Curated annotation (Swiss-Prot):
One of its GO terms (molecular function) is sulfate adenylyltransferase (ATP) activity. It holds the Pfam family GTP_EFTU_D2. GO terms for biological process: hydrogen sulfide biosynthetic process; sulfate assimilation. Residues 22-240 form the tr-type G domain. Keywords: ATP-binding, GTP-binding, Nucleotide-binding, Nucleotidyltransferase, Transferase. Residues 110-113 are annotated as: G3. Residues 89-93 are annotated as: G2. This is Sulfate adenylyltransferase subunit 1. HAMAP family: Sulf_adenylyltr_sub1 (MF_00062). Heterodimer composed of CysD, the smaller subunit, and CysN. Its EC number is 2.7.7.4. Belongs to the TRAFAC class translation factor GTPase superfamily. Classic translation factor GTPase family. CysN/NodQ subfamily. It comes from Chromohalobacter salexigens (strain ATCC BAA-138 / DSM 3043 / CIP 106854 / NCIMB 13768 / 1H11). Pathway: Sulfur metabolism; hydrogen sulfide biosynthesis; sulfite from sulfate: step 1/3.
């Protein structure tokens, strides 16, 4: 089955050790409806020999009832797992697949192309380092192509591979490929992505997916898989600005107090001076503890427990940063928000926000503008409908450190949660502290919360509950 089947059979320990040392690339496939995203992933798995025999037999059988490729095996069925997806021939949910080659491990997120599932695409893109954006060679750059490119850029994906698919349907025309490249480059001039590659391919026929195509001898670049194996993503991590959001305080006994969390940015070492935000108290790192023993250095993505020389007040939601770091503290910030719910975002409503490891109440007080994903122009808006993207002012209850998403995605992103249904209704990328933001911590309480608080104070006076309005200066 696999390119390493013989090694697995002969020496499983060597295989596991070799597999552990490979670096990992997370990437998404996106584009307009029926551009061939699922077929492309199926082709990657098939031609890199990462399909089990029973899987191949299953999709061969399914191709007779749900396939769209005639007598050929419909490789898209490897990814389109939902029954409704197979019946409609489209991708609805984000489908994840895993495979590896001799050089690298991969996690693929196949995201839906339909506009009403843009929120699913944003979810898949949030953890990716690279985006493969498919364009149908017959249709060129479409609205959804621009939308997905903009979302990928918004979420900080620095590497874009523009895969011009279905080249077999335009007779492998170099002129058509060059025309699409020029059209996309004109649009991409408005994006921030520093690394863009273009590959002409046919996922159905396998041209330029894993192996170079004989039908497109005019194309001198690498096949798609070679690009995925060689793209350099390690330098994308921020190793300068230390950020460790505290997930919980580990206190197994009286002689140990550790602060657990995933290092989001920077390099942490024992003996390093750090300070806690938002309190500003400073201390020195004593140990970096992990399940496998103490570390001399910790890097972004590692889950660690940190002990300090001093006993200072630290709790869930606080950040550990470098002692000399200048991180603004504010009760309001500017953010780009992708709205993910049928009920539109209307300024003034109170929501729950989850930012890094901190949970807090907040509200979107103003929509500065909505971005037209076709032209990237800004337009005035009073509300954000489903799948809309806008720049907003967010005010929160309390003071918190504010990170730009481009500095540290882990501490500069948040989700918006409806307080009544507990449904995630939006996702946001922080762009900095809001102009005129203070640290008053004021919040506009909903009527039912004020009434509920009053009932508790009336009927349970022994609880000594405080008036929520007085607590926040209302």
């Amino acid at each position: 089955m696999s390119h390493q089947s013989s090694l697995i059979a002969e020496d499983i320990e060597s295989y596991l050790q070799e597999h552990e040392q490979k670096d990992l690339l997370r990437f998404i496939t996106c584009g307009s409806v029926d551009d061939g995203k699922s077929t492309l992933i199926g082709r990657l798995l098939h031609d890199s020999k990462m399909i089990y025999e029973d899987q191949l037999a299953a999709i061969t059988q399914a191709s007779r009832t749900s396939g769209t490729t005639g007598d050929q095996v419909d490789l898209a069925l490897l990814v389109d797992g939902l029954q409704s997806e197979r019946e409609q021939g489209i991708t609805i949910d984000v489908a994840y697949r895993y495979f590896s080659t001799d050089k690298r491990k991969f996690i693929i997120a196949d995201t839906p192309g339909h506009e009403q599932y843009t929120r699913n695409m944003a979810t898949g893109a949030s953890t990716a380092s690279l985006a493969v954006i498919l364009i149908d060679a017959r249709h060129g750059v479409q609205t959804q192509t621009r939308r997905h490119s903009f979302i990928a850029d918004l979420l900080g994906i620095q590497h874009l591979v523009i895969a011009v698919n279905k080249m077999d349907l335009v007779d492998y025309s170099q002129a058509r490929f060059d025309e699409i490249v020029a059209e996309y480059r004109e649009f991409a001039a408005k994006l921030n992505a520093p690394d863009i590659h273009f590959v002409p391919l046919s996922a159905l026929e396998g041209d330029n997916v894993v192996n170079k195509s004989e039908a497109m001898s005019w194309y001198e670049g690498p096949a798609l898989l070679h690009l995925l194996e060689t793209v350099e993503v390690t330098h994308d991590k921020n190793l300068t600005d230390l950020r460790l959001p505290v997930q919980y305080v580990n206190r197994p006994h009286l002689d140990f107090r550790g602060y657990c969390g995933t290092l989001e940015a920077g390099i942490l070492r024992p003996g390093q001076r750090v300070k806690v935000l938002p309190s500003g108290k400073a201390s020195t790192v004593a140990r970096i503890v992990t399940f496998d023993g103490d570390l001399e250095e910790a890097y972004p993505g590692q889950a660690i427990t940190v002990t300090l020389d001093d006993e200072i007040d630290i709790s869930r939601g606080d950040w550990l940063v470098a002692e000399d770091a200048e991180v603004p503290l504010a009760d309001a910030f500017e953010a780009d928000i992708v709205w993910m719910h049928d009920t539109a975002l209307e300024p003034g409503r109170l929501y729950d926000l989850k930012l890094a490891t901190r949970d807090l109440a907040g509200k979107i007080t103003r929509i500065d503008y909505q971005t037209d994903v076709n032209t990237l122009e800004h337009h005035a808006a009073e509300r954000l409908a489903l799948n809309a993207i806008g720049r907003c002012r967010v005010e929160v209850a309390g003071t918190l450190p504010v990170d730009d998403y481009r500095v540290s995605p882990g501490t500069g992103s948040f989700i918006v949660i409806d307080r009544m249904t507990n449904v995630t209704v939006g996702a946001g990328m922080v762009r900095g502290a809001a102009e005129g933001a203070g640290n008053t911590g004021e919040v506009d309480w909903q009527a039912f919360e004020i009434e509920f608080n009053a009932l508790i104070r009336k009927h349970f006076p022994h609880w000594e509950a405080k008036d929520v309005r007085s607590l926040f200066g209302q």
